[in-house]
């Protein structure tokens, strides 16, 4: 499954409707094709999408909308999704997610969501209505009409028969099972200011050396239900830790965040999923950030169409993109 476009209306933090497009809308030059992912024929997707702006300009909010839309089409319960906070106390928010599925169909999922305050004062979200449109991509005459469903009737609508379905889970779950399709999401939204390395069995030595050349060994070991971390610097004795949080005493925040990020990059490039990173430059120098971007913008490495979506304060990162 590949996301083509996301639109949102009725969100408290946005005065205007939000419209985010992930496919190229203009003609693609031959030299640009290597940095894009070819969907089919002349349709290409952007593999590295950046939202650039000053503080409090809404970058993180946009990332939360994308995360919410992705989780809806992945059949995650809205009330369990971290990015649900973007809905606030909305009376009626409409999110349309346009995607391309394994059957070579372009689909549009419209999800209408409302908030209700619980006894504890927290907002609880439920889906008021849902509709799904679809059309074979072969019937689309040009890019202009790729996500245009004007005049078409939905192929499915949410109804009361779906009593077995939780009221915060999208009915697109049936479509996904039928098409044997899903979307893989890796999010670093919660790692913006928290850097605790989660358990991982495979940290490539090349990645560790790139982030900190003084590290000779870093690996996790699980024995009898306990986790041990082996850390060794060059020309020094090995250190054994039993708590990942203790790594902060020995490794910089940039190294920890780098290991987390590059481990996820490996998964995303393999699965063709989505990696969301807020404030990508946090603890990273420009060289590391541009290396990350180039992983996704190299069609030889990114054969499955993995997508990096990130926010940043640094406009100089735009130099990595070809602009009109």
Residue ranges and their predicted role:
Residues 44, 48-50, 54, 64-115:
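Conserved P-loop NTP-binding catalytic core
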Residues 1-4, 207-213, 230-238:
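N-terminal accessory segments
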Residues 1-70, 238-324:
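Switch/communication elements of ASCE P-loop NTPase nucleotide-binding domains
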Residues 66, 70-73, 200, 204-215, ...:
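Hydrophobic, Leu/Ile/Phe/Ala-enriched alpha-helical segments that form helix-helix packing faces
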Residues 112-224:
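Electropositive, glycine-dotted interaction segments
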């Amino acid at each position: 499954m590949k996301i083509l476009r996301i639109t949102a209306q009725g969100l408290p933090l946005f005065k205007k409707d939000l419209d985010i497009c992930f496919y190229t809308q203009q003609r693609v030059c031959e030299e640009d094709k290597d940095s894009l992912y070819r969907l089919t024929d002349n349709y290409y997707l952007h593999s590295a999408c950046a939202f650039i702006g000053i503080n409090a300009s809404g970058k993180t909010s946009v990332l939360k909308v994308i995360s919410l839309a992705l989780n809806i089409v992945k059949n995650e319960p809205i009330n369990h999704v971290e990015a649900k906070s973007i809905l606030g106390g909305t009376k009626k928010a409409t999110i349309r997610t346009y995607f391309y599925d394994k059957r070579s169909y372009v689909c549009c999922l419209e999800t209408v969501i409302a908030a209700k305050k619980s006894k504890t004062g927290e907002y609880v979200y439920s889906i008021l209505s849902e509709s799904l449109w679809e059309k074979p991509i072969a019937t689309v005459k040009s890019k202009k009409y790729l996500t245009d469903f004007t005049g078409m009737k939905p192929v499915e609508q949410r109804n009361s028969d779906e009593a077995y379905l939780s009221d915060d889970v999208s009915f697109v779950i049936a479509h996904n099972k039928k098409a044997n399709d899903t979307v893989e999401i890796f999010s670093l939204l919660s790692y913006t200011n928290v850097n605790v390395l989660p358990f991982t069995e495979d940290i490539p030595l090349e990645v560790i050396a790139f982030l900190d050349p003084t590290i000779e060994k870093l690996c996790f070991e699980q024995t009898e239900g306990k986790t041990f971390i082996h850390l060794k610097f060059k020309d020094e004795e090995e250190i054994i830790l039993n708590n990942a949080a203790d790594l902060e005493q020995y490794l910089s925040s940039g190294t920890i965040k780098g290991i987390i990020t590059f481990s996820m990059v490996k998964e995303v490039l393999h699965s063709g999923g989505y990696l969301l990173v807020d404030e990508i430059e946090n603890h990273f120098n420009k060289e590391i950030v541009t290396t990350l971007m180039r992983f996704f913008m190299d069609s030889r490495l990114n054969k499955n169409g993995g997508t990096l979506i990130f926010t940043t304060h640094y406009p100089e990162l735009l130099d990595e993109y070809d602009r009109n």
